[in-house]
């Protein structure tokens, strides 16, 4: 597996452990992070690693039990990595399970994760939260 794909894999593992220092350490200081519009935690494009923690990871841990990112496949093209998989978790407020397929497009620059774009059916998340 490529170094870029290993970085993406390490990021997902750090998210699953709620390992904030590793998450921040993997992200480029000049970040371009975009969640899918309509995703509950979407608020435009984030430019700083701490934004990912504050606007995504903290709310995920607050709102979901057993949240995980299960990657089924990586498509690697140099410094670009596409990961295909499923989000899973149980919403704490509703008790509903969220199985949600996703595609993530990553770009590595200067040995760090520099860009993230999420593609997913955001309605599935909203249904689990209602």
Go through the PLM ranges and name each one.
Residues 2, 43-47, 97:
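Residues at secondary-structure transition points
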Residues 8-18, 41-44, 60-64, 84:
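Short, mixed-charge, low-aromatic patches
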Residues 22, 28-79:
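A solvent-exposed, acidic/Ser-Thr-rich amphipathic alpha-helical stretch
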Residues 1-26, 30, 127-130:
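Short, low-complexity N-terminal intrinsically disordered segments enriched in polar/charged residues
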Residues 8, 12-15, 27, 35, ...:
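Hydrophobic alpha-helical core bundles mediating ligand binding, dimerization, or RNAP-core interactions
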Residues 3, 57-130:
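A beta-strand edge to alpha-helix "cap/lid" segment located at domain peripheries
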Residues 2-14, 49-53, 90, 103:
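Generic alpha-helical hydrophobic packing signal
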Residues 8-11, 23-24, 31, 52-53, ...:
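Hydrophobic pocket/interface hotspot
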